[in-house]
Amino acid sequence: RFIDTYTDAHPVFRKSTQRLHSKYHHYAGVIVDLFYDHFLAKNWSTYSDENLEEYTETFYQSLRDHYDILSERTKGMMPYLIEHNWLLSYQTVEGIGRILTQMDNRTKNASNMRFSSNELVEFYPEFEEEFTIFFKDLQEQVSLKMQHL
């Protein structure tokens, strides 16, 4: 919860969402979250010594092992997540586009998220720079939080 709250309030994250808000309204934050996931996956080796493929499989196995305690929302999403290997597909713009389309198909309102990968391509350097700044700040905040636990 700390990370979600921190992310939503961060000025750089908000700057990224403002770029999309007029077209995607309240879905802008969800979209930027996925864009940032893309940059994390793309640059995974910068942030982790563990191979992304190994991390992904470990994560999926953890979901399977702890299925009984997962939220209903997570349980509902889990088959799509694993079957389409969402975490690994975050590495590519095409993978993000597929995920956005799948999410768009499942929204009740007309979100048009399926089209937002166009903005990812159009503003790629800007989003990547914003992610890099944001993620550095997030790592520092998490480190501070961990020291106080």
Segments (PLM) and residue ranges:
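N-terminal leader/auxiliary helical segments
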Residues: R1-L149
